[in-house]
């Protein structure tokens, strides 16, 4: 009875133990997530990289000496692709855009490079003896205009072919290009110098150099992309919800101008006001127009250019006569300009909450700031814009209160002056533009305004704006405001339930060597350490390649005048090398992780919930790759290092597993090193057997003591042998040999070893048999219970299937009955209606008969 109770309790324990084990296995299986590497995920990060140019220069200008050197650009894509990004919101900031800085540096480099072969005018930094030029008849009549008085006839000494000889030459200079050395203005003759001599070097533009802007497309190299904001009312800063990706920007004309933006793009709907901080009067304001205003500029023909030698092989091209000079001007439609100013004023008043918007001329400064400066046909015009910016607008009444010009004139004429010494974009150098011997006529479109705000009392209803400019970055911002460069990150990690099948250390113990010898030390540990070194070397090799390419680029930039590479050629080389570096870097990481050639690569790195505790469904069903990348961005480096360590350990395990094949060679069995291993293993086996024997003896003794057995003395004597006259089993009592008699003890080492091995094998056999019987019983019980459960579920399924069929049949019958009854009622109603209609004549006849009676 006691044995049955124990057996019954054991059965209950086994039952509950199996249930608990199943629950634990289910929970562990549900929680086990592993890191999986994905290559080609749509993830990007803000970056700064070298952009290269694309242009159709040949379709615009056949002159090969254009200052923008766009012939070195790659051809534009005839079918540019623009891919819209759905459900993507990206932040843009036109005021902190590296594309603007890069374009600014490119324009400076292009100016420097195009003027390198031209004549340096350093010898002209001498004293100029200047006076007002007289007409050919020797008199200066009253009909000399103010612009004509703006020129000086200057004489100066230059070096001849013989360096110790000086020669006096004459040339005409614009008054804006020279400054007096002394303050003596009482006489007509004073000493002057060129305006640039104390600030920057000067170079005369080559005769064949042209300044006609050609559209430039900035393109991102492989591994990078350009994001474009397509919101029609985007002001340049903040989030943009309508985002697309392009490889190149639209064609941007590098027009260098102040106050007015020329030949740019237009706003699509309404005038857009852009400023880094509109309330800060120190920040410039860019007004992006939605309709262009045409401006036409001209300068009549003059055959007045002369060649003045200034040294060995050098010449200065100057004006010989000013017969009709000074008639440069520009015309703008008054109606178009008034309409444009009205829209700009309305937008400014709305943003600043002001009712009176005033436009006034520039408050002062360099000619480049106080006038509208630009290049027209090779000459640099400086036009007075006081006629454009001299009006007041009442926002509440939507009308123009005052306007300086006479409204009867259809055009606004801007008087322009021409300068020949022009500060370059960066202000570090100057250029001397020789006079052009032809009629100059150019037409441009005003697409934007550069404004500054006076500031003052905040609670005032008035606000004054003046034309500004001077920082060419604002010109480039007006076109690049909707672009930003991002770096594509194709490598992504995310948790999945898939685990890489690897060679684990526990499984390596059941190898070929273990089958023969039982225990094997960790072989090839040195090879494993070397594998780690190889990983480090691979990374250093990649770093060396990148460093080498950077050194090459620096050398090319330093020697580009010897290699005859243009600025665009350098950028194309940088872009191509950068693309190779990006590809090699990604492939190197995939190779280190053991994922070469795979787009989805599982690992055996467990996912840590501290990186992200979101559920698997929440990650894969509700999050985009960009959102997921932002969430785990702080742990990406750690995850990468864990994947690398895991792959390194995997390679080490594989190497050790392959090293087990050396036991297949019988020749190695006779090696003295292997024999030492055999002896060591034999000693370990003998020691293990002795230890097991001692443990079993102690356990047996303890068990007998618990049952009341007293151990014998250690001085137990051997039983005395029987005599020949008393053979065994022939004593008086007869029968079997007494149980209390001692048996013969074993003598000899081999006999003891054999007896211990026999006892150990029997013990192991009995225990193993009991374990197998218990396992068979458990499997039998589980099978029986499982079969019963399956039969129960089958019966339950059949029952509910029958119930569903009965319910469906009942429902169908009820619907059929209801439809039949309804149909009968409808038919009956129709019949009654028809009878009523048919009985109408009869009722009329009966009524007439009754009335006649």
Curated annotation (Swiss-Prot):
Motif annotated as Di-leucine internalization motif, chain positions: 852-853
V3 as annotated region, ranges: 297-329
Presence of keyword S-adenosyl-L-methionine: no
GO-annotated cellular components: host cell endosome membrane; host cell plasma membrane; membrane; viral envelope; virion membrane
Keywords from the named record: AIDS, Apoptosis, Clathrin-mediated endocytosis of virus by host, Cleavage on pair of basic residues, Coiled coil, Disulfide bond, Fusion of virus membrane with host endosomal membrane, Fusion of virus membrane with host membrane, Glycoprotein, Host cell membrane, Host endosome, Host membrane, Host-virus interaction, Lipoprotein, Membrane, Palmitate, Signal, Transmembrane, Transmembrane helix, Viral attachment to host cell, Viral envelope protein, Viral immunoevasion, Viral penetration into host cytoplasm, Virion, Virus endocytosis by host, Virus entry into host cell
Region (V5): 457-468, 460-468
Site entry (Cleavage), positions: 508-509
V2, as annotated region: 154-197
Name under which the protein is recorded: Envelope glycoprotein gp160
Residue ranges of the region described as V1: 130-153
Start and end residues of each stretch annotated as CD4-binding loop: 362-372
Coiled coil location: 630-664
Region (Fusion peptide): 509-529
Lipidation (S-palmitoyl cysteine): 761, 834
């Amino acid at each position: 009875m006691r044995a049955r109770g124990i057996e019954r309790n054991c059965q209950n324990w086994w039952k509950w133990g199996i249930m608990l084990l199943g629950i634990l296995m289910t929970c562990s299986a549900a929680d086990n997530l592993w890191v999986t590497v994905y290559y080609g995920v749509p993830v990007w990060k803000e970056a700064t990289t070298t952009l290269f140019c694309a242009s159709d220069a040949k379709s615009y200008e056949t002159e090969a000496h254009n200052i923008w050197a766009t012939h070195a650009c790659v051809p534009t894509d005839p079918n540019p692709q623009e891919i819209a990004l759905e459900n993507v919101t990206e932040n843009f900031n036109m005021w902190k855009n590296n594309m603007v800085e890069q374009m600014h540096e490119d324009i400076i480099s292009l100016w420097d490079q195009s003027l390198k072969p031209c004549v340096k005018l350093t010898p002209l930094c001498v004293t100029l003896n200047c006076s007002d030029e007289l007409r050919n008849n020797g008199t200066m009549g009253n009909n000399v205009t103010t612009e004509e008085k703006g020129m000086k006839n200057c004489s100066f000494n230059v070096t001849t072919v013989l360096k110790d000889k000086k020669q006096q030459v004459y040339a005409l200079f614009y008054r804006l290009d020279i400054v007096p050395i002394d303050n003596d203005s009482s006489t007509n003759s004073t000493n002057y110098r060129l305006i640039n001599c104390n600030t920057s070097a000067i170079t005369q533009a080559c005769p064949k150099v042209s300044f006609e802007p050609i559209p430039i497309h900035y393109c991102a190299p492989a591994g990078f992309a350009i994001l474009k904001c397509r919101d029609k009312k985007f002001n340049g800063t903040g989030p943009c919800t309508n985002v697309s990706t392009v490889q190149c920007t639209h064609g941007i004309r590098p027009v260098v101008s102040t106050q007015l933006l020329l030949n740019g793009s237009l706003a699509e709907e309404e005038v857009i006001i852009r400023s880094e901080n509109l309330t800060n009067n120190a920040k410039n304001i860019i007004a992006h127009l939605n309709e262009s205003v045409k401006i036409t500029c001209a300068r009549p023909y003059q055959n007045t250019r002369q060649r003045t030698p200034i040294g060995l092989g050098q010449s200065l091209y100057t004006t010989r006569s000013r017969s009709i000079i000074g008639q440069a001007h520009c015309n703008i439609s008054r109606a178009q300009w008034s309409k444009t100013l009205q829209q700009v004023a309305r937008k400014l008043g709305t943003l600043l909450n002001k009712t009176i918007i005033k436009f006034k001329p520039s408050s002062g400064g360099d000619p480049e700031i106080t006038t509208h400066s630009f290049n027209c046909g090779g000459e640099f015009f400086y036009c007075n814009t006081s006629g454009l910016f001299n009006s007041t607008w009442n926002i509440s009444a939507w009308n123009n209160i005052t306007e300086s010009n006479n409204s009867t004139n259809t055009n606004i004429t801007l008087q322009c002056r021409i300068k020949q010494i022009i500060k370059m974009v960066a202000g570090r150098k100057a250029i001397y533009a020789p006079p052009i011997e032809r009629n100059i006529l150019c037409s441009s479109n005003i697409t934007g305004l550069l404004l500054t705000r006076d500031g003052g009392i905040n609670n005032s209803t008035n606000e004054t704006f003046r034309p500004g400019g001077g920082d060419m970055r604002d010109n480039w911002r007006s076109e690049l405001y909707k672009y930003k460069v991002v770096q594509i990150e194709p490598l992504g990690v995310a948790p999945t339930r898939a685990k890489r099948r690897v060679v684990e250390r526990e499984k390596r113990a059941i190898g070929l060597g273990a089958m023969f010898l039982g225990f094997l030390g960790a072989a090839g540990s040195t090879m494993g350490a070397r594998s780690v070194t190889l990983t480090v070397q691979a990374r250093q090799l990649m770093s060396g390649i990148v460093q080498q390419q950077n050194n090459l680029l620096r050398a090319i930039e330093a020697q580009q005048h010897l290699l005859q590479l243009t600025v665009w050629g350098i950028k194309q080389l940088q872009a191509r090398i950068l693309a190779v570096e990006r590809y090699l870097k990604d492939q190197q990481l995939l190779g280190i992780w053991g994922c070469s050639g795979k787009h989805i690569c599982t690992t055996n790195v467990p996912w840590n919930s501290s990186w992200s505790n979101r559920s698997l469904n929440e990650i894969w069903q509700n999050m985009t790759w960009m959102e997921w990348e932002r969430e785990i961005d702080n742990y990406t480096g750690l995850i990468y290092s864990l994947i690398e360590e895991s792959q390194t350990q995997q390679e080490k395990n594989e190497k050790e597993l392959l090293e087990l094949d050396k036991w297949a060679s019988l020749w190695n069995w006779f090696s003295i090193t292997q024999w030492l291993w055999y002896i060591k293993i034999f000693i370990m086996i003998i020691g293990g057997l002795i230890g097991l024997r001692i443990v079993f003896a102690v356990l047996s003794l303890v068990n007998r003591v618990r049952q009341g057995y007293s151990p014998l003395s250690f001085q137990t004597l051997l039983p005395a042998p029987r005599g020949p006259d008393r053979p065994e089993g022939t004593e008086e009592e007869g029968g079997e040999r007494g149980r209390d008699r001692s048996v013969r003890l074993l003598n000899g080492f081999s006999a003891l070893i054999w007896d211990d091995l026999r006892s150990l094998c029997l013990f192991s056999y009995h225990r193993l048999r009991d374990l197998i019987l218990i396992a068979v019983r458990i499997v039998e019980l589980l099978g029986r219970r499982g079969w019963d459960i399956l039969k129960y579920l089958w019966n339950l399924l059949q029952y509910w299937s029958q119930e569903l069929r009965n319910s469906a049949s009942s429902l169908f019958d009820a619907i059929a009955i209801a439809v039949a009854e309804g149909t009968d009622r409808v038919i009956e109603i129709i019949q009654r209606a028809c009878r009523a209609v048919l009985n109408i004549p009869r009722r009329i006849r009966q009524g007439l008969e009754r009335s006649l009676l």
